[in-house]
Amino acid sequence: PIKSSAASDVYKRQAWEFLTEVIKLDKNRLYVTVYPDDQEAYDTWHNDCGVEESHITRLEDNFWEIGEGPCGPDSEIFFDQGPEHGCDDPNCAPGCDCDRYLEIWNLVFTQFNKMPDGSYEPLQHKNIDTGAGLERLASVLQGCKTNFETDLIFPIIEATAKRAGVTYNENPNTDVSLKVIADHARAVTALISDGVLPSNEGRGYVLRRILRRAVRHGRLLGIE
């Protein structure tokens, strides 16, 4: 059986408080998912956080593991972007492959150790891993369709489009190149600021490949 801890309940309440009271997202547009056997997580969301039962979904996918080693049930928080982003399926809900429900927060309660034979043993020292998507939260707060249109990234797209003499959102192929350059420019900046330089091995080779791909998309836009 899945057993949560007092600490995991606190993290759920803090996540909910941050989303609804600090950045003031509409509670009616927030949905949560839990592992089917994690009744305590379900009760915490419903009884302690006030999440309506219709906004809580039990999903088999809500169990985090990467092969052998520490693992456990998780809860995810989704933001409903509206039916215009959906698939028109009347049963559409968090976990659907369409774009209606955007995952913005994940809380993992690591309480098991997966053994080589596939069995699960309780961990002596349990822990909680929680995180939110900064760019996804920004897209929700700013009413943007994608992360690329937030004020974190779009200025790079605008500058690149101006340099190339193109307009964003007019040609799908052009948009792909603009997004690749914006994304790669940020990655390159982070790597170089961490002391990485282009080379033939290790992190330097990764940086080199990222630079090459950004340059290739720049040439596709006509930038020499």
Q: What are these language model-derived features?
A:
Residues 9-134, 138-151, 170, 179-180, ...:
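Active-site cavity-forming subdomains of large catalytic enzyme subunits
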Residues 147-161, 179, 224:
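Substrate-binding beta-hairpin/strand module that engages nucleic acids
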